[in-house]
Each structure stands twice: as structure tokens, then as C-alpha cells.
Amino acid sequence: EIPQNLGSGIPHDRIKLPNGQWCKTPGDLCSSSSECCKAKHSNSVTYASFCSREWSGQQGLFINQCRTCNVESSMC
């Protein structure tokens, strides 16, 4: 299950990237922010989408995951 703080509940556009792969949704592993799906256009000013370094308690190490959050939130 994807933690809510990664933005899984925020609507996003699922688009194909220039490399032919689909963008990655919140919680997916990533290597750069350009891989991550962006919030729907109506929310693009309110929300930011990026590849973020997160602690994985299950794996016991840091991993890079796509994240979408409200830019006015202290969690962003």
C-alpha cells in the first residue's frame, strides 16, 4: 500500500514519456523527477510532483519514489 503522504490520492495525468514508457505514479521507484506523473492540469499550480528520497522501513534504506504534494503544505 502506498502511503498517503506520497500523494496517491491526488488526481494526476498518466502520460507516455518521450522514452515510450508511462510516467510513474506516486510511490513508484524513480531516478529523476521527469519520470513522475504530474498533477492534473487544473491542479498544476497547487501541486508539485517530483522524485523524492524516502526512508523505506521495510528495506532499511533510502529509496527514490515519485511524490505529489500540495505546495502550501509543510510536507512538500
From Swiss-Prot:
Disulfide bond among keywords: yes
Tissues expressed in: Expressed by the venom gland.
Cysteines engaged in disulfide bonds, as pairs: 23-37, 30-51, 36-66, 69-76
Record-linked InterPro entries: Cys_Knot_tox
Domain of life of the source: Eukaryota
One Gene Ontology cellular component: extracellular region
Its biological purpose: Neurotoxin with probable ion channel impairing activity. Is both paralytic and lethal, when injected into lepidopteran larvae.
Name by which UniProt lists this protein: U1-cyrtautoxin-As1b
Organism for this UniProt entry: Apomastus schlingeri
High-level lineage: Eukaryota, Metazoa, Ecdysozoa, Arthropoda, Chelicerata
